[in-house]
Amino acid sequence: MKKTSLSSWHEKAGAKIIDFGGWLMPVQYSGIMAEHKAVRSAAGLFDVSHMGNFYVKGRRALEFLQSVTTNDLSRTVDGQAQYTIMLYENGGIVDDLIIYRIDSVTFFLIVNAGNCDKDFAWLEEHAGAFEGVQLSNHSDQLSLIALQGPKAFSILSRVIPEIDADRLPSFHFRQLPFMGAELMVARTGYTGEAGVEICLPNALAQPLWEALLDAGREDGLVPVGLGARDTLRLEMGYSLYGHEIDQDTNPLEARLKWVVSMEKGPFIGREACRQVELDPRFGVAGFSLEGRALARQGCRVFNADRQEIGKVCSGTISPTLQEPIGTASLVREYLKPGTPVFVEIRGSLQPGQIRRLPFVKPALL
């Protein structure tokens, strides 16, 4: 079982530790509800060092990445990040990821922890056609810390004075100094709140973590586990691999058409996307339920005539709205907000309705 550079800190802090994709990770500290509300009202600190990270370098690096991802990376500039997807030829999703353009020949990729080995092997398989492209896996050498919430930048500025929120637009990053080294600070996140994700050498993870907690204590900054990370992303309607998206899901049927550039030229899975674009059958929608029953992944969804129309992707009790919410993959004619639905939970049909995403609208990135 793998551990992050902060594992001993989490254990000493009394975090509940779970196996998450082969990593021992904190799922909660004080409690999911309290941690969630802290991020929405003040700030939260996340250890997400289990995420995979690769470098792609070389004269043809951009050309290579354009061929294996769906978004148009050529539209980015140095210092900009882009959310994108890698597809199989049949249009199923290998993974969703963020690519950071350091310069025209150097790119940094952050991928999902559970897909790290698969993703790297898949990239290696396709890199051979692009002479000079070099791939390297740095997942065991780098840590990733996320600071999220409306007070995130105020707290960060006390530890890294060089940060300037006005000079760091959404999905851009800067190299900033800390303890004689450089950190990559990106204005990205998985909560819908303002904030950053910071990539740094393992040796600096605990010093930065503790410095941020000290700087933000009076503002209500708390450590946050993977449990609240999931409820935060679900309130925003963000996809999670293995739930809203997987190897059997086409992005055009998962609310991800906006990251598929059909105009940029050839990429793996393009023809499959074109076929779905002509005749999409399914889509992902948000829903809420009456009462307090909690829908889980795989629960069947029915229409008002009790005909099965899809399955639940994710479900939780929203800490912000105090009601059961979730996402479901449904036949397209049932995606309109306000449409009545019924979710089968432990043999009983629970009434609800389709809701517009996101469920909440905090101060965005």
Swiss-Prot record:
First-tier enzyme category under EC: transferase
Catalytic activity, EC: 2.1.2.10
InterPro entries with a match to the protein in the record: GCS_T, GCS_T_bac, GCST_C, GCV_T_N, GcvT/YgfZ/DmdA, GcvT/YgfZ_C, TrmE/GcvT_dom1
The organism's place on the tree of life at top rank: Bacteria
Keyword Transcription in record: no
GO CC terms, sorted: cytosol; glycine cleavage complex
Gene3D superfamilies reported in the protein's UniProt record: Aminomethyltransferase beta-barrel domains (3.30.70.1400), Aminomethyltransferase fragment (4.10.1250.10), Probable tRNA modification gtpase trme, domain 1 (3.30.1360.120)
Molecular function, one GO term: aminomethyltransferase activity
Reaction(s) the record says it catalyses: N(6)-[(R)-S(8)-aminomethyldihydrolipoyl]-L-lysyl-[protein] + (6S)-5,6,7,8-tetrahydrofolate = N(6)-[(R)-dihydrolipoyl]-L-lysyl-[protein] + (6R)-5,10-methylene-5,6,7,8-tetrahydrofolate + NH4(+)
Role this protein plays: The glycine cleavage system catalyzes the degradation of glycine.
Similarity comment: Belongs to the GcvT family.
Quaternary state and interactors: The glycine cleavage system is composed of four proteins: P, T, L and H.
Name by which UniProt lists this protein: Aminomethyltransferase
Taxonomic lineage: Bacteria, Pseudomonadati, Chlorobiota, Chlorobiia, Chlorobiales
